Amino acid sequence: MTKMSIRGISLNVKVMGKGYPLVLMHGGPGLDHTSLLPLKPLMHQFTLVFYDHRCNGRSEGAEVTSMTMENLTADADALRQLLGFEKWAVFGHSFGGNVALEYALRYPQNLSHLILMDTGGDQWWVNQNAPELLAKRGYSASAVQAARRFYNGQLTPGEFLPTSMKFMSAYYHHFSLLGMAKDFVFGPTPKMRPEALIFGYSKLLKGWTVMDRLGEIKVPTLVIAGRDDFLFPPEHQVALAGGITNAHLEIIERAGHEAPSERPAEIQRVVREFLSAVKADNN
């Protein structure tokens, strides 16, 4: 990774591969780009730009209160300019998809394609619906209450990990604690920032929605989600794709919210086919 000076802060950035540029916006808030590294093989067809949002991961120099949609999207566009790309394709997963939607609305002239992965256009699904869905799926009252506190930013930094572990299995179609432990030991080390999560859910995303503005997005758009995603379930994916002109919807079977790590080969295939088809149509 390289530290790049962007708008007075230091962003943690890694560029790899060759071909048309594709920036990948990670989820959270409070996480980093490592959750999207299973998509690295796309580097054989595209120039991939991984980075940590301000106040997230190993990016430095910004107060957590500066984590606004205005700054998050302006950071991304300044990164595009610094890397010398006239336009790029934008991929956003989870919270990164929220940022990607805002980017598409604020900088429509600077992206050519939009890919939304396990994300949504209205935070109600996370704040209110997700805990209720956990209850319907048989999670304990303690786990449901933990999720409600977590997704509304009602916790301290020290509670971040123990609280999330109470419902961590919900993120996956098939959850393996041993597999997660192996990823932490042998895989890239993620950098978690609990203060960003707390601010994000309690302030930044509180009441956030762009559902009434989806019709403004005109670029070719791909909406992808795991069938078992409890944060943004299939019924919301249908509404999200339906609100964007000519958006294509793909539901991935045997996958939850962490579809990039559960079904990386299938996600890569869908992304390749989407970008190739759009390119062919435009020739």
Model-derived features with residue positions:
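Conserved HGGG/HGGXW glycine-rich cap/lid loop of the alpha/beta-hydrolase fold
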Residues: 7-61, 65, 79-80
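Short beta-strand/loop motif that positions the catalytic acidic residue
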Residues: 217, 223-225
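Conserved hydrolase catalytic core segment
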Residues: 86-130
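Flexible "cap/lid" loop of the alpha/beta hydrolase fold
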Residues: 114-153
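Catalytic active-site module of serine/aspartate enzymes centered on a nucleophile-bearing elbow/loop
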Residues: 247-283
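Active-site loop/oxyanion-hole signature of alpha/beta-hydrolase fold enzymes
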Residues: 50-95, 269
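Alpha/beta-hydrolase
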Residues: 146-212, 219
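Conserved alpha/beta-hydrolase "acid-adjacent" motif
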Residues: 230-236
